[in-house]
Protein backbone atom coordinates (compact mmCIF):
# COMPACT_ATOMS: atom_id res chain seq x y z
CA UNK A 1 0.00 0.00 0.00
CA UNK A 2 2.78 2.41 0.94
CA UNK A 3 4.60 1.95 -2.37
CA UNK A 4 1.36 2.28 -4.33
CA UNK A 5 0.65 5.51 -2.48
CA UNK A 6 4.11 6.89 -3.15
CA UNK A 7 3.89 5.94 -6.83
CA UNK A 8 0.56 7.66 -7.31
CA UNK A 9 1.67 10.73 -5.41
CA UNK A 10 4.79 10.99 -7.56
CA UNK A 11 2.65 10.90 -10.70
CA UNK A 12 0.31 13.54 -9.33
CA UNK A 13 3.24 15.70 -8.30
CA UNK A 14 4.48 15.78 -11.88
CA UNK A 15 1.07 16.90 -13.08
CA UNK A 16 0.41 19.43 -10.34
CA UNK A 17 3.74 21.24 -10.06
CA UNK A 18 3.53 23.40 -13.24
CA UNK A 19 0.21 24.93 -12.14
CA UNK A 20 1.37 25.42 -8.55
CA UNK A 21 4.61 27.06 -9.66
CA UNK A 22 2.63 29.87 -11.29
CA UNK A 23 1.01 30.83 -7.97
CA UNK A 24 3.49 31.80 -5.28
CA UNK A 25 0.95 32.19 -2.49
CA UNK A 26 1.15 29.61 0.33
CA UNK A 27 -1.25 26.76 -0.29
CA UNK A 28 -3.71 25.25 2.16
CA UNK A 29 -5.65 22.00 1.78
CA UNK A 30 -8.62 20.91 3.88
CA UNK A 31 -9.28 17.18 4.28
CA UNK A 32 -12.66 15.54 4.94
CA UNK A 33 -13.74 15.87 8.55
CA UNK A 34 -13.95 12.87 10.84
CA UNK A 35 -17.15 12.10 12.71
CA UNK A 36 -15.87 11.32 16.18
CA UNK A 37 -19.12 9.74 17.33
CA UNK A 38 -22.33 11.74 17.02
CA UNK A 39 -25.91 11.26 18.15
CA UNK A 40 -29.28 12.90 17.63
CA UNK A 41 -29.40 13.08 13.81
CA UNK A 42 -29.70 10.64 10.92
CA UNK A 43 -26.40 8.96 10.04
CA UNK A 44 -26.59 10.46 6.56
CA UNK A 45 -26.54 13.95 8.03
CA UNK A 46 -23.32 13.18 9.87
CA UNK A 47 -21.80 11.52 6.80
CA UNK A 48 -22.71 14.62 4.83
CA UNK A 49 -21.10 16.97 7.34
CA UNK A 50 -17.77 15.23 6.80
CA UNK A 51 -17.64 16.70 3.29
CA UNK A 52 -19.88 19.68 4.03
CA UNK A 53 -17.63 21.09 6.73
CA UNK A 54 -14.59 20.37 4.57
CA UNK A 55 -16.06 22.44 1.76
CA UNK A 56 -17.32 25.17 4.08
CA UNK A 57 -13.89 25.65 5.61
CA UNK A 58 -12.29 25.57 2.16
CA UNK A 59 -14.70 28.29 1.06
CA UNK A 60 -13.83 30.42 4.08
CA UNK A 61 -10.12 30.20 3.27
CA UNK A 62 -10.85 31.10 -0.35
CA UNK A 63 -12.05 34.52 0.82
CA UNK A 64 -8.47 35.35 1.84
CA UNK A 65 -6.42 36.67 -1.11
CA UNK A 66 -3.20 35.78 0.73
CA UNK A 67 -3.95 32.04 0.38
CA UNK A 68 -3.99 29.59 -2.50
CA UNK A 69 -6.70 27.08 -1.66
CA UNK A 70 -6.57 23.50 -2.95
CA UNK A 71 -9.85 22.41 -4.51
CA UNK A 72 -11.74 19.71 -2.62
CA UNK A 73 -12.00 17.60 -5.78
CA UNK A 74 -8.22 17.14 -5.88
CA UNK A 75 -8.13 15.82 -2.33
CA UNK A 76 -11.15 13.61 -3.01
CA UNK A 77 -9.55 12.02 -6.06
CA UNK A 78 -6.24 11.29 -4.35
CA UNK A 79 -7.94 9.75 -1.32
CA UNK A 80 -10.25 7.67 -3.52
CA UNK A 81 -7.41 6.34 -5.66
CA UNK A 82 -5.61 5.08 -2.58
CA UNK A 83 -8.75 3.93 -0.75
CA UNK A 84 -7.86 6.33 2.04
CA UNK A 85 -10.10 8.40 4.23
CA UNK A 86 -13.20 6.28 3.68
CA UNK A 87 -14.12 6.94 7.30
CA UNK A 88 -12.58 10.41 7.35
CA UNK A 89 -9.38 9.13 9.01
CA UNK A 90 -6.04 10.24 7.61
CA UNK A 91 -2.95 10.59 9.78
CA UNK A 92 -0.67 13.63 9.71
CA UNK A 93 2.11 11.89 7.77
CA UNK A 94 -0.18 10.74 4.96
CA UNK A 95 -1.88 14.12 4.85
CA UNK A 96 1.49 15.84 4.58
CA UNK A 97 2.53 13.60 1.67
CA UNK A 98 -0.67 14.40 -0.19
CA UNK A 99 -0.27 18.05 0.74
CA UNK A 100 3.11 18.12 -0.98
CA UNK A 101 1.58 16.72 -4.16
CA UNK A 102 -1.00 19.49 -4.38
CA UNK A 103 1.52 22.16 -3.42
CA UNK A 104 0.09 22.96 0.00
CA UNK A 105 2.14 24.46 2.79
CA UNK A 106 -0.44 23.47 5.40
CA UNK A 107 -3.02 20.72 5.66
CA UNK A 108 -6.09 21.01 7.84
CA UNK A 109 -7.41 17.86 9.53
CA UNK A 110 -10.72 18.28 11.30
CA UNK A 111 -13.22 16.34 13.32
CA UNK A 112 -16.55 16.90 14.98
CA UNK A 113 -18.79 15.40 17.64
CA UNK A 114 -22.49 16.20 17.87
CA UNK A 115 -24.10 14.96 21.08
CA UNK A 116 -27.77 15.75 20.69
CA UNK A 117 -27.10 19.31 19.59
CA UNK A 118 -24.00 19.99 21.70
CA UNK A 119 -21.52 20.41 18.85
CA UNK A 120 -17.72 20.40 19.07
CA UNK A 121 -15.19 21.00 16.29
CA UNK A 122 -11.51 20.01 16.59
CA UNK A 123 -8.87 21.16 14.11
CA UNK A 124 -5.23 20.19 13.58
CA UNK A 125 -2.94 22.32 11.42
CA UNK A 126 -0.22 20.18 9.83
CA UNK A 127 3.05 21.56 8.47
CA UNK A 128 3.42 19.76 5.13
CA UNK A 129 7.20 20.10 5.07
CA UNK A 130 7.78 18.44 8.46
CA UNK A 131 4.50 16.52 9.04
CA UNK A 132 4.34 18.21 12.45
CA UNK A 133 1.09 19.39 13.97
CA UNK A 134 1.69 23.12 14.31
CA UNK A 135 -1.40 24.02 16.25
CA UNK A 136 -4.80 22.78 17.32
CA UNK A 137 -8.02 24.76 17.42
CA UNK A 138 -11.37 23.98 19.01
CA UNK A 139 -14.86 25.39 18.93
CA UNK A 140 -17.91 24.34 20.88
CA UNK A 141 -21.46 25.61 20.64
CA UNK A 142 -25.01 24.55 19.91
CA UNK A 143 -25.57 22.78 16.61
CA UNK A 144 -27.77 25.66 15.48
CA UNK A 145 -24.63 27.83 15.38
CA UNK A 146 -22.68 25.45 13.14
CA UNK A 147 -21.84 27.98 10.43
CA UNK A 148 -20.57 30.46 13.01
CA UNK A 149 -18.27 27.77 14.42
CA UNK A 150 -16.77 27.17 10.98
CA UNK A 151 -16.05 30.87 10.44
CA UNK A 152 -14.58 31.05 13.95
CA UNK A 153 -12.10 28.21 13.41
CA UNK A 154 -11.22 29.63 9.99
CA UNK A 155 -10.18 32.90 11.61
CA UNK A 156 -8.27 31.05 14.34
CA UNK A 157 -6.38 28.95 11.78
CA UNK A 158 -5.43 32.03 9.77
CA UNK A 159 -3.98 33.57 12.91
CA UNK A 160 -2.33 30.28 13.84
CA UNK A 161 -0.22 30.23 10.67
CA UNK A 162 0.49 33.98 10.87
CA UNK A 163 -1.36 34.91 7.70
CA UNK A 164 -2.76 38.37 7.10
CA UNK A 165 -6.36 38.59 8.23
CA UNK A 166 -9.20 39.20 5.82
CA UNK A 167 -9.86 42.84 4.98
CA UNK A 168 -12.13 44.25 7.69
CA UNK A 169 -15.17 44.61 5.44
CA UNK A 170 -14.89 41.03 4.18
CA UNK A 171 -14.37 39.70 7.71
CA UNK A 172 -17.41 41.54 9.02
CA UNK A 173 -19.53 40.21 6.17
CA UNK A 174 -18.51 36.62 6.92
CA UNK A 175 -18.94 36.96 10.69
CA UNK A 176 -22.33 38.66 10.36
CA UNK A 177 -23.63 36.11 7.88
CA UNK A 178 -26.27 33.91 9.51
CA UNK A 179 -26.64 30.64 7.63
CA UNK A 180 -29.24 28.38 9.29
CA UNK A 181 -27.98 24.93 10.21
CA UNK A 182 -30.91 23.44 8.30
CA UNK A 183 -29.54 25.05 5.12
CA UNK A 184 -26.02 23.86 5.96
CA UNK A 185 -27.33 20.31 6.38
CA UNK A 186 -29.11 20.35 3.01
CA UNK A 187 -26.00 21.81 1.39
CA UNK A 188 -23.78 19.14 2.94
CA UNK A 189 -26.11 16.35 1.83
CA UNK A 190 -26.13 17.81 -1.68
CA UNK A 191 -22.32 17.60 -1.78
CA UNK A 192 -22.48 14.01 -0.53
CA UNK A 193 -24.89 12.98 -3.29
CA UNK A 194 -22.90 14.88 -5.90
CA UNK A 195 -19.80 12.95 -4.83
CA UNK A 196 -21.78 9.73 -5.24
CA UNK A 197 -22.77 10.72 -8.76
CA UNK A 198 -26.47 11.23 -7.98
CA UNK A 199 -26.92 14.62 -9.64
CA UNK A 200 -30.72 14.66 -9.45
CA UNK A 201 -30.72 14.20 -5.67
CA UNK A 202 -27.88 16.69 -5.28
CA UNK A 203 -29.82 19.26 -7.31
CA UNK A 204 -32.92 18.73 -5.17
CA UNK A 205 -30.93 19.25 -1.97
CA UNK A 206 -29.09 22.34 -3.22
CA UNK A 207 -32.49 23.83 -4.07
CA UNK A 208 -33.82 23.00 -0.61
CA UNK A 209 -30.81 24.72 0.94
CA UNK A 210 -31.58 27.82 -1.13
CA UNK A 211 -35.24 27.72 -0.09
CA UNK A 212 -34.17 27.86 3.56
CA UNK A 213 -31.48 30.51 2.93
CA UNK A 214 -32.07 32.37 -0.36
CA UNK A 215 -28.66 34.11 -0.18
CA UNK A 216 -26.80 30.79 -0.07
CA UNK A 217 -24.21 31.57 -2.75
CA UNK A 218 -22.35 28.29 -2.28
CA UNK A 219 -25.50 26.24 -2.96
CA UNK A 220 -26.17 28.27 -6.10
CA UNK A 221 -22.61 27.63 -7.26
CA UNK A 222 -23.16 23.92 -6.58
CA UNK A 223 -26.17 23.96 -8.90
CA UNK A 224 -24.11 25.67 -11.59
CA UNK A 225 -21.38 23.06 -11.31
CA UNK A 226 -23.93 20.26 -11.70
CA UNK A 227 -25.26 21.91 -14.85
CA UNK A 228 -21.83 22.34 -16.42
Positions of predicted regions on the chain:
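Positively charged n-region of N-terminal signal peptides that target proteins for export
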Residues: 1-4
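Bacterial N-terminal signal peptides
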Residues: 6-18
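Residue-level detector of alpha-helical transmembrane segments in integral membrane proteins
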Residues: 11-12, 25, 58, 207
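Generic detector of contiguous secondary-structure segments
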Residues: 15, 19, 55, 206-208
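A short hydrophobic/aromatic micro-motif that marks alpha-helical segments and, especially, helix-coil
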Residues: 17, 86, 120, 227-228
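C-terminal/domain-edge helix-coil "capping" segments
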Residues: 22-26, 129, 133-228
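An acidic helix/loop motif centered on a single conserved Asp/Glu
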Residues: 23-162
Amino acid sequence: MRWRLLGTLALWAGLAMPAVAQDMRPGIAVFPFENGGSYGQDKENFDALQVGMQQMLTTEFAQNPALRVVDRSQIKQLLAEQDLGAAGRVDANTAARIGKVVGAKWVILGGFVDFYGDFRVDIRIVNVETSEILKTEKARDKRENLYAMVTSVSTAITRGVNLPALPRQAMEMRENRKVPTEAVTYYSRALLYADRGNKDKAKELFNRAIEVFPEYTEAKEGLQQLAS
